Amino acid sequence: MLDARYIRENLETVEARLKTRGEGVDIALFKELDGRRRELLQQSETLKALRNKVTEEIARLQDKSQAAERKTEMREVSQQIKGIDESLRSVEEELQNFLLTVPNVPNETTPIGKSEEDNVVVRTWGEVPTLSFEPKPHWEIGEGLGILDFERGAKLAGARFTLYRGAGARLERALINYMLDLHTDEHKYIEMLPPFMVNRECMTGTGQLPKFEEDLFHMEGVDFFLIPTAEVPVTNIHRGEILKGSDLPISYVAYTPCFRKEAGSYGKDTRGLIRQHQFNKVELVKFTSPEDSYQQLQKLLGHAEEVLRRLQIPYRVVELCTGDIGFSAAKTFDIEVWLPGQNCYREISSCSCFEDFQARRAGIRFRPEEKAKPEFVHTLNGSGLAVGRTLVAVLENYQQADGSVLIPEVLRPYMGGAERIS
């Protein structure tokens, strides 16, 4: 959430930078609500100061009739204050609801653009393999090996659900454990295992609510949501807390299943594992000081890249433009993995700095020093990685002409020493 004072003092800048997202903000409504709030607040404070002053005078009055008259006047003032404060609460709630729908201001270094066509390729890693045979897409590989069952997945739950079996299930588990071990043992993240359902406050804190409720699975009868990403519960671990500056940066990693309606994806990626209602993901989350956040973003990005480097799978890093970054993000880098069966790069991780946008919504602050005034932290997160899409990348990049799939060396200890799925 943006700070109302920041918007007030930088109206033209905020409006111009939000327009680069392709979204306009009703600045006139903000000015009206903010002006009304400040006016009511001033009226309330003026009357409360008057009441306090007169109350002190009444205590010194010797004339009882005069004191009674002043008390009557103050009762009327108290009624005025009550009415003004009720109006103030109403306006503050309306302003708060408005601010919750305003996206984050893109960082000034974020490339300006309208869509993914304007994103900037930062670097590529690895050689795109030249195969001596026509590469298959992962769904054909998985079905041919009997490790992915799309038909039975649909029978169990409908479209965009998949049943993993045998070596497919074990490969998914191997990837999860490999990622967690890498991030905890070498990158020194603290592992978390959060609830897979969260309350409305969590969804509001990270920015999914109120604007994107249609893409969330909501539990009937109770006000819980299935998480769309571990970012939601892990970021909210410190909701409403004041952290020690000496503890920053705090780095968490969490494996969770993720649940998304994919409401706007009708007709997209209808085959395979790329776009599912339920999928596994290993998420990286950081809490940092404002001064350190963009340095930590590069570290987080590097940690996500390392997963693919050790798997020896080609990828590229893309910086998203203002028209393509998410609602809460100030800056985002995507990692896109090469998929031979589809002859293209596909997103496998999105690494973002949110500056204080989420922290302000969730009330996450820190003290730079022991007695210093609390400040909002900066939050960061990124996939490290999306597990299903990594499995897709393994199947397509390690496929062999005979239909088998070689197992990357780093995964073999997690696969009982097996070298091939056939």
Curated annotation (Swiss-Prot):
Compartments where located: Cytoplasm
Gene Ontology biological process terms in this record: selenocysteine biosynthetic process; seryl-tRNA aminoacylation
InterPro entries hit by this protein: aa-tRNA-synt_IIb (IPR002314), aa-tRNA-synth_II (IPR006195), aa-tRNA-synth_II/BPL/LPL (IPR045864), Ser-tRNA-ligase_type_1 (IPR002317), Ser-tRNA-synth_1_N (IPR015866), SerRS_1_N_sf (IPR042103), SerRS_core (IPR033729), tRNA-bd_arm (IPR010978)
Record GO terms (molecular function): ATP binding; serine-tRNA ligase activity
UniProt key word Phosphoprotein: no
EC number: 6.1.1.11
Binding site for L-serine: 229-231, 283, 383
Catalyses which reaction(s): tRNA(Ser) + L-serine + ATP = L-seryl-tRNA(Ser) + AMP + diphosphate + H(+); tRNA(Sec) + L-serine + ATP = L-seryl-tRNA(Sec) + AMP + diphosphate + H(+)
Binding site for ATP: 260-262, 347-350
Pathway per the UniProt entry: Aminoacyl-tRNA biosynthesis; selenocysteinyl-tRNA(Sec) biosynthesis; L-seryl-tRNA(Sec) from L-serine and tRNA(Sec): step 1/1
Keyword set includes Ligase: yes
Principal location listed in the UniProt entry: cytoplasm
Keywords (A to Z) from UniProt: Aminoacyl-tRNA synthetase, ATP-binding, Cytoplasm, Ligase, Nucleotide-binding, Protein biosynthesis
Any Gene Ontology CC annotation: cytoplasm
Function field: Catalyzes the attachment of serine to tRNA(Ser). Is also able to aminoacylate tRNA(Sec) with serine, to form the misacylated tRNA L-seryl-tRNA(Sec), which will be further converted into selenocysteinyl-tRNA(Sec).
Family the entry assigns: Belongs to the class-II aminoacyl-tRNA synthetase family. Type-1 seryl-tRNA synthetase subfamily.
Record comment regarding domains: Consists of two distinct domains, a catalytic core and a N-terminal extension that is involved in tRNA binding.
Subunit structure: Homodimer. The tRNA molecule binds across the dimer.
Name of the protein in question: Serine--tRNA ligase
Protein's organism: Citrifermentans bemidjiense (strain ATCC BAA-1014 / DSM 16622 / JCM 12645 / Bem)
Organism phylogeny: Bacteria, Pseudomonadati, Thermodesulfobacteriota, Desulfuromonadia, Geobacterales
